[in-house]
């Protein structure tokens, strides 16, 4: 039960609230609101659970065709139906597992990739400005300036993953780039 101490109230650190079982305590109010916004975007049928149809619709919206097998594998990662609390628990598990950080980054970018392993620049720019910590137009442009974009407006996912994960603690890999 290791909790990150970057929460809003460090004075309550010594107090245990229910043995740390409240996943909402692991995130700031802003983070919870952003997760909720993302959940609501994904819960297309508004039944409070992200199912296969919801995932398919989300992938379709970002221009990524996902196979039934891919969708089934994503849903199988959850130990129970994915309601909002389960989604938060899944993010919390990922956040506390430091060795998974690079894998999480890779999976996030691969979710946007087409069959050739590329991301459409315009689709990615739109996602940066729409979801999570929304980028401004200038911030999105700055981020895209750091990426190799081919003449067709495509970004190589593996190049982005390597760029982002190389500095994650392996100084030799960071110097190599």
Curated annotation (Swiss-Prot):
GO molecular function: calcium ion binding
Ranges of Basic residues composition bias in the record: 1-16
GO cellular component term, pick one: myosin complex
Domain EF-hand: 30-65, 135-170
Region (IgE-binding epitope): 13-30, 22-48, 49-66, 58-90, 79-99, 118-141
Keywords noted in UniProt: Allergen, Calcium, Metal-binding, Motor protein, Muscle protein, Myosin, Repeat
Official protein name in the record: Myosin regulatory light chain 2
Organism: Penaeus vannamei
């Amino acid at each position: 039960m290791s909790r990150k101490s970057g929460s809003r109230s460090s004075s309550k650190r010594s107090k245990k609230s229910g043995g740390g079982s409240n996943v909402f305590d692991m995130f700031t109010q802003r983070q919870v609101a952003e997760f909720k916004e993302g959940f609501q975007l994904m819960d297309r049928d508004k039944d409070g659970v992200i199912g296969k149809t919801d995932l398919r619709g989300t992938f379709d919206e970002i221009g990524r065709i996902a196979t039934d097998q891919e969708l089934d594998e994503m849903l199988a990662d959850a130990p129970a139906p994915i309601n909002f609390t389960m989604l938060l628990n899944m993010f919390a598990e990922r956040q506390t597992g430091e060795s998974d950080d690079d894998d999480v980054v890779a999976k996030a970018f691969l979710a946007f990739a087409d069959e050739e392993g590329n991301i459409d620049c315009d689709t990615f720019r739109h996602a940066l400005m729409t979801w999570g910590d929304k980028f401004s137009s200038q911030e999105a442009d700055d981020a895209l300036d750091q990426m190799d974009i081919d003449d067709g407006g495509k970004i190589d996912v593996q190049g982005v993953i390597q760029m982002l994960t190389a500095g994650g603690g392996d100084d030799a890999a960071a110097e190599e780039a």
